[in-house]
Swiss-Prot record:
Function: Beta-glucosidases are one of a number of cellulolytic enzymes involved in the degradation of cellulosic biomass. Catalyzes the last step releasing glucose from the inhibitory cellobiose.
Name of protein: Probable beta-glucosidase G
Keywords of this entry: Carbohydrate metabolism, Cellulose degradation, Glycoprotein, Glycosidase, Hydrolase, Polysaccharide degradation, Secreted, Signal
The gene coding this protein: bglG
Known glycosylation sites: N40, N58, N229, N276, N343, N350, N402, N507, N563, N584, N623, N662, N715
Leader sequence segment: 1-20
Active site, per annotation: D304
Domain of life: Eukaryota
Pathway: Glycan metabolism; cellulose degradation
A Gene Ontology cellular-component term: extracellular space
Length: 815
């Protein structure tokens, strides 16, 4: 297996392989995801494959946290050993995660709340657009603005820590059940989104938590299986092991977490699965080596809920906070004990764990608390959270929580208008034949599909549902809607304004099985709008890439009788679109999960009040079988460690894979149409230093790693012109092709810059891109360093990964 050599050289893995996984084999199904692990797959056990990096580095306050660090150290100096154990161990309480108060020191505790698109356990809070939706804007300002607004709501409800944003999963597989919580199947775009979102959260005063670190790319077997007749630590089958080589982990999966560290993220959540054999929450190579040493991370590492599988090993491995604190599946049985808790005091007293390590754990927890001023006038926890918290209801509380804050306070402000605008800006126009869109006060429209109307399952999406529009996915990353504007509601309101006849049919089975001409009266409508949806949730991966609820058949039925069929998808991510070339399907719009203003956002696009400018954050293939790297869905052996996911595709995910193998696609990464047209011209480059070395200067590590990697080394500029007749926005995208001297396996091109610009008809604007050293570097597994290869780079700028009209060459490093 090719990847094993890189793992061995890097020190990420110390083992020899017999055989890895070949995703091209007969174990893969084309119509539903299925990858059955071959019997001769190399099995990595929990120990001996990922080298120890000990001790866990102490926080230094680097990056401007020195004053807060001093306050944290002073706080820790006043704690008893029992209080120190409390500070690193979660307790059931009013929030999803809770650190108890220490009244004698004036510390009111910490409240940690889900999630990446809303405060899940709260009333009178907004449901924002999902991560994949926000990424589809390709708008750095919107990403920041969304972060600020969400941070304001978390703080308003008394939550100290917002459990988001998400860079893991990155999107290795289109089947990933939680891809919608993250941003894009590209490390650069995800990195920018992470950085801007974190800055927004923390500028609003709430701690951000970057998750899930690292290699958490599938839901199937993400957790171990426990013996139902055994103890709460009696595991009969371990979680899957993500086996990733050194270069791949640096250039793909670690990349956006470097942006998070640079943004001074307060905390990082380690993931459920194993990494190269060892559980991610006790893997010292990953937590101590990559995160705390290489990236200079100054905050604290918290476990995913129930992701702690040891005490001393996890503490030494770099875990600082055990959430939610108990044993068993998802850590929900604190009454039975904890890997931390009293075991921390025992380990310190018997000399197994040095007290200095425990002190650093708490210093890391408290430093961002002081840095963000959460010790000064921070809002009290909203008591309604306790009433809504089904994860740890009051009956499970072991400690007392003094909830004196105002109940059910409304923190939404004017965020509804912001969510509406963000949803529209994220909407992607994939097809628009014969100027089907925008609609211009049509005389009649027909609305089809079970995604158009009101939900029938209530305000929280706990599981998939047949009837009702889909505006958020499921699991801990969902939200509780205080209201939801549906597409049908918004279309009827617009129809009333325009005196349009609006008819609707929401039963997909009826539509698919009927002659739709018998449904509408009296004549065919001017436009037929078909709303389709695709559910995804935490805890399970998608079974298909097609739309749900016979959506393809619904489109076929409508398009067979209506020559102006417009399809809108509300999806978690990638969909097969077999109807894309149907002559009667005149327009296709991808809206993803837009949040509570879903209907208003899509009507703004359909009627041209907002010109679509969203771009795909992934590739839509012609066929589902064209994708590589499906999740491992089954094993044929029964060993405790047998579940493995070998990332043999290495750097070839999404567009990198399609480019490397010259596979034609339906809609490429970065693609998206507009109601106007744009052109590019006059590409220019300018070096920012007289001499650029291959090896970066070795500077003292700061949050984000070696500061030299973040230094700009080249400027690239290009002129963008709106050549159409309406105002619109577009996203020039810069891709880099490395010289031939770069190591084998380097992708044909990689995104390294983008900017969204809005232009009036005929207006031109010069857009500049700053290329940092890291943008032109690869990770060298021998020297363990980022290197700029010698030779000529190709710089291309265009409007998608396969529409790159502007090209130039640069040679940063010569022999």
């Amino acid at each position: 297996m090719a990847s094993i050599a890189h793992l061995v050289v890097s020190g990420l893995l110390a083992a020899t392989a017999v055989n890895g996984q070949n995703y091209g084999g007969s174990g893969r199904s084309d119509d539903a995801f299925s990858y059955v692990q071959p019997r001769n797959t190399t099995i990595l056990g929990q120990y001996g494959h990922s080298p120890a990096v000990l001790p866990s580095p102490n926080a230094t306050g680097a990056g401007g946290w020195e004053e807060a660090l001093a306050k944290a150290q002073q706080f820790v100096a006043q704690l008893t050993l029992e209080e120190k154990a409390d500070m690193v161990t979660g307790q059931p309480g009013p929030c999803v995660g809770n650190i108890v108060a220490i009244p004698r020191l004036g510390f009111k505790g910490l409240c940690l709340q889900d999630g990446p698109l809303a405060i899940r356990v709260a009333d009178y809070a907004s449901v924002f657009s999902a991560g994949v939706t926000a990424a589809s804007t390709w708008d750095k300002d919107i990403l920041y603005e969304r972060g600020v607004a969400m941070g304001e709501e978390f703080k308003g409800k008394g939550a100290h820590v917002a459990l988001g944003p998400v860079a893991g999963p990155l999107g290795r597989s289109g089947y990933g059940g939680r891809n919608w919580e993250g941003f894009a199947a590209d490390p650069y775009l995800t990195g920018v989104a992470m950085e801007r979102t974190i800055q927004g959260y923390q500028d609003a005063g709430v701690q951000a938590c970057a998750k899930h670190f690292i290699g958490n790319e599938q839901e199937t077997q993400r957790n171990p299986n426990y013996n139902p007749n055994g103890t709460l630590t009696d595991v009969i089958q371990e979680a899957i092991s993500s086996n990733i080589d050194d270069r791949t982990i640096h250039e793909l999966y670690l990349w956006p977490f470097a942006n998070a560290a640079r943004a001074k993220v307060a905390s990082v959540m380690c993931s459920y699965q194993r990494l190269n054999g060892s559980y991610a929450c006790q893997n010292s190579k990953v937590l101590n080596g990559l995160l705390k040493e290489e990236l200079g991370f100054q905050g604290y590492v918290q476990s995913d809920w129930g992701g702690t599988h040891s005490g001393v090993s996890s503490i030494e491995g770099g875990l600082d906070m055990n959430m939610p604190g108990g044993l068993g599946q998802y850590g929900q049985t604190p009454e039975a004990g904890s890997f931390f808790g009293k075991n921390v005091t025992f380990a310190v007293n018997n000399g197994t764990v040095d007290i200095s390590r425990v002190d650093d754990m708490i210093v890391r927890i408290m430093t961002p608390y002081y840095w963000l001023g959460q010790d000064q006038g921070y809002p009290e926890i909203d008591p309604s959270s306790a009433d809504l918290n089904t994860f740890s209801p009051r009956s499970t509380w072991l400690r007392e929580f003094n909830l004196t804050g105002e109940r059910s306070r409304d923190v939404r402000g004017d965020h509804g208008e912001l969510i509406r605008r963000h949803g529209a800006e994220a909407t992607i126009l994939l097809k628009n034949e014969n100027k089907a869109l925008p609609l211009k006060a049509p005389k009649s429209i027909a609305v089809f599909g079970n995604d158009a109307g009101d939900t029938t399952e209530g305000a929280v999406n706990k599981a998939t549902f047949e009837f009702g529009t889909l505006a958020a996915g499921g699991g801990s990353g969902t939200g509780r809607f205080t209201y939801l504007v549906t597409p049908l509601e918004a279309l009827k309101a617009r129809g009333k304004q325009d005196n349009t006849l609006v008819q609707w049919w929401l039963n997909n089975t009826l539509i698919a099985d009927s002659d739709v001409t018998s449904l509408w009266v009296p004549t065919p409508p001017d436009a037929c709008l078909v709303f389709l949806k695709t559910w995804a949730e935490e805890g399970s991966d998608r079974e298909y890439l097609s739309v749900d609820w016979n959506g393809n058949e619904v489109v076929d039925s409508v398009a067979s009788k209506c020559n102006n069929t417009i399809v809108v998808t509300h999806s978690s991510g990638i969909n097969e679109l077999p109807f894309a070339n149907h002559p009667n399907v005149t327009a296709i719009v991808a809206a993803h999960y837009p949040g509570q203003e879903s209907g208003n956002s899509i009507v703004d696009i359909l009627y041209g009040d907002v010109n679509p400018s969203g771009k795909l954050p992934y590739t839509i293939a012609k066929n589902g079988s064209d994708y590589n790297a499906p999740p491992t869905t089954a094993v044929e052996t029964t060993g405790a460690d047998d579940w493995q996911a070998w990332f043999d595709e290495k750097l070839e995910i999404d567009y990198r894979y399609f480019d490397a193998h010259n596979i034609s696609v339906l809609y490429e990464f970065g693609f998206g149409l507009s109601y106007t047209t744009f052109s590019l011209s006059d590409i220019k480059t300018e070096p920012l230093a007289e001499s650029i070395s291959s090896v970066p200067e070795q500077l003292p590590i700061q949050p984000g790693g070696n500061p030299a990697l973040w230094e700009s080394v080249y400027n690239v500029s290009v002129t963008v012109t709106n050549t159409g007749d309406v105002k619109g926005a577009t996203v020039p995208q810069l891709y880099v092709t490395f010289p031939d001297s770069a190591p084998a396996g380097t992708p044909p091109k990689q995104l390294r810059g983008f900017d969204k610009v809005s232009l009036a008809p005929g207006e031109s604007q010069t857009v500049g891109f700053e290329l940092m050293r890291r943008d032109l570097s690869y990770w060298d597994v021998v020297s363990q360093e980022w290197l700029i290869p010698e030779g000529e780079f190709t710089i291309r700028v265009g409007f998608s990964s396969r529409d790159l009209s502007q090209e130039t060459k640069i040679t940063p490093v010569t022999a």
